[in-house]
Amino acid sequence: MTDTTGRIPLWLIGTLTGILVIGLIGIFFYGSYSGLGSSL
């Protein structure tokens, strides 16, 4: 992990993107399961 060229590391971007995607999918499925996703 020494490939830090002054920008944000690629693994950090991938990790944050994965967490956001999993969170959005989880919220979407939880909302549809609770009956709140029908308004979306």
From Swiss-Prot:
It is a single-pass membrane protein. Pfam families: PsbJ. One of its GO terms (cellular component) is chloroplast thylakoid membrane. It comes from the Eukaryota. Keywords: Chloroplast, Membrane, Photosynthesis, Photosystem II, Plastid, Reaction center, Thylakoid, Transmembrane, Transmembrane helix. Belongs to the PsbJ family. This is Photosystem II reaction center protein J.
